[in-house]
Amino acid sequence: MKRNAAFIQILFSLGRLLGVVIACVMMASCQQKSKVEMTPWGTPVGGEADTIPTGFTLSDIQANGELIMLTLNGPDTYYDYRGRGMGLQFLLCERFAQQLGVKLRVEVCQDTTELLSRLKAGEGDVIAVPLPQRYQQLDYCGYSSTDSLKQMWAVLKNNTELADTLNRWFRPELVAEVKAEESFLLSTKSVTRRVYSPMLNRSGGIISRFDALFQKYAPVARWDWRLLAAQCYQESTFDPQARSWAGACGLMQIMPATATHLGLPHSQIFEPEPNIAAAAKYIAQLTTHFNDIPERNERCYFVLAAYNGGFFHIRDAMSLAQKNGRDPHRWDEVSDYVLKLSTPEYYRDPVVKHGYMRGSETVNYVAGIRNRWAQYRGFARAASAPGLTGTPRPAKRKNKYSI
């Protein structure tokens, strides 16, 4: 009996040991499977889906008349600046599209994974973001960074003609040329302004020769006509023929696309009355997007900011302010986050939907108009038409214009 009991105990121990061995083998097998190499589009290397598409060829792109650029939002890649695309990678890709004789379409992605998956799906032709050369399914071509970790644009591996054309087109000197161009454009002002702008007749309360038009169309915007005049001076210094490098036109610097949206014929965009009338209509439209701001003067500051920097960017700044415990309906608090939208920590925040913006220009724009409006109110009479009635508060922040 004792011998049988000992034998049974040995069998039991061997069984447990065998179980441990089997478990270890299974775990090792699982770990081996988890280390299977994946393609950039999320399929196992060597699997049925591990195929490399060719994408649209150069001939296809030229026949379609459009090059599709896949990129990320940021100051060095792509961002919207008053309706005009900016950023080093965008400007370079724009030049390449011009070389091909086609239009450029920009598709902004959230991250590298989306860049790669959309390229594979045929939703883009070139990834215009410097990528590290570690994806064998891509052809690296065109733009090349100069740092120690060489990074380049990319197309699909088998799209040889497009890759070769990009390589022949790209020259390292192009980067310096485009950087200089962008720097010049962003630093160029169409007019020189002063906070305390000259009035046509200070003693008579006459701001400009367009006062009658400001008074006529201020009720459309539901603004004080002197605020409309202050904005006009900021935009063009009362020059009806003013035109910015970005294409903004006339007294109120209306972009051609905005003019089309407002029903303003391009043939009339430089005419004072149609230009002011369209601007007043646009201001009224922007105002409806800020009806959640109860205080009227505060609302007008947000409208001014949206006129300059874009409605969606201002809404992003409001979301950031609210997230960080600030009042999203006070411009002096939201303007801090307009400024912060130029830093990655903030323009990549999950509540931000429209990415990077050059916030300093918009903050200075609003400050300049607020100060000028306060000056105009001291000398020019208010019109009888409805408009803003409260006394404007001076801008909290010192602005960049000299007196």
Predicted regions and their residues:
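Substrate-binding/active-site groove segments that recognize
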Residues: 241-267, 275-285, 369
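Export/targeting segments at the very N-terminus of extracytoplasmic proteins
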Residues: 49, 189-238, 273-276, 291-294, ...
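Low-complexity, Gly/Ser/Thr/Pro-rich intrinsically disordered linker/tail segments
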Residues: 361-403
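Acidic, polar ligand-binding/catalytic clefts
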Residues: 52, 59, 76, 94, ...
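Catalytic and substrate-binding regions of cell-wall glycan-acting enzymes that process beta-1,4-linked
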Residues: 155, 301-375
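C-terminal motif of bacterial Sec signal peptides marking the signal peptidase cleavage site
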Residues: 26-29
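Extracytoplasmic small-molecule ligand-binding "clamshell" domains
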Residues: 32, 36-130, 166
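Extended ligand-binding regions for polar small-molecule ligands
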Residues: 31-32, 36-52, 87-99, 152-190, ...
